[in-house]
Regions:
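Proline/Glycine/Serine-rich low-complexity intrinsically disordered segments
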Residues: 1-123
Length: 123
């Protein structure tokens, strides 16, 4: 698991107490190397990162996602966010409106399928 990540907090809080050996890594690519070499059985990591950084590459062939997506608010909060300067209410409204608009028809799905084998928007 990537050191300092929300996935590490989840792993330490939920998996380690259940008897899973959790190994924190400084960089995600080190995790992939140890999975390939057989030193790790798996990882808890950001789905978009794993897809782009490993599964979509030749070295990721034969590997895939298992288990349910993790949405525990205690560890992961209420979704992703976009950083904006305070007081940028119009920009925030415009971004939220644009997201809502492309999700209201099939535009979002078409764009998403071009880049991902899953829905990165989540639940």
């Amino acid at each position: 698991v990537l050191k300092g990540s929300t996935q590490e907090k989840f792993s330490m809080g939920e998996l380690k107490p259940a008897g899973v050996t959790v190994v924190p890594y400084e960089a995600q690519d080190q995790v992939y190397l140890d999975i390939k070499s057989g030193r790790l059985d798996g990882t808890v990591a950001d789905k978009v990162e794993v897809n782009g950084g490993f599964l979509s590459k030749p070295e990721g062939k034969g590997y895939g996602f298992v288990g349910a997506d993790l949405y525990d608010v205690k560890y992961f909060g209420y979704g992703v966010g976009v950083a904006m300067r305070k007081g940028q209410d119009k920009l925030k409204a415009d971004v939220n409106g644009a997201i809502k608009a492309i999700r209201s028809d099939d535009r979002y799905a078409k764009i998403s399928k071009k880049y991902f084998s899953f829905d990165p928007y989540g639940n």
